[in-house]
Amino acid sequence: MKGDTGEAADMSSDEARRSSAVKALASEYKSLVEEPVEGFQVGLAQEDCLFEWQVAIFGPPETLYQGGYFKARMKFPQDYPYSPPTMKFLTKVWHPNVYENGDLCISILHPPIDDPQSGELPCERWNPTQTVRTILLSVISLLNEPNTFSPANVDASVMYRRWKESNGQDKEYEEIIRKQVLASRDEAEKDGVKVPMTLEDYTRASRPQKTEPDPSIELNDFYDDFDPEEDDTSEQDESTGDSFYSK
């Protein structure tokens, strides 16, 4: 009997955490659709699931990534915002803080533990007051100013330091990124996306695509459709285009 009571309590606790996560994500998603972060567009990977988002990132003007179109995916835990989401680039990105498989390494997505070896302060790590908006702002900052103290891609970090220390005379880092930017434009063309090339276009690209705000998200639509035991989306599925990017 005690065992049944304990299991029921655990289920109730899990449901409460998930309910809290759904409410937080629905609120954040609505906010980002109505007032996007400059240089980003967000969408749901599946219309009936708030726990997996797709992100389109436009390379900022006057940076190496200018004119680039980079796809990423964010996955949220059942106890969000108490635990951080993960973020993975689906487009190839040569950067000191992006692993070869696309996983993004950034302090704001790291759990709030004290780890002196990481070189990160506890205040730089995730906490429940952070939001997707603050994550996206951190990502655009990291693209321009990589953290080379503990790189995810050592080769990219070495190239970046050479490029930086030579005041741009060492072109290897820059040339790799330029090739990826050009390749990303081909992907944008396939998706029917116009890549912003000027500052004016860049700010315009982030604006909502509809003149009327979307109807309020019905939270009940999301409670029963997400299976936490489901396998993660395969690498093959993640690398393909989908309806969000083709809009």
What is the predicted role of each segment?
Residues M1-L104, I108-S118, C123:
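Strand-helix-loop interaction patch of compact alpha/beta domains
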Residues M1-D14, P146-K247:
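Charge-rich (especially acidic), low-complexity segments
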Residues K30, R73, K88, S107, ...:
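Residue-level recognition of well-ordered secondary-structure positions
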Residues P81-K171:
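Histidine-centered catalytic/metal-coordination loop motif
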Residues E35, Q46, G59, K71, ...:
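A generic structural signal for solvent-exposed, polar alpha-helical segments
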Residues S31-G39, P61, Q78-D79, P112-D115, ...:
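Short amphipathic alpha-helical interaction elements and helix-loop-helix interfaces
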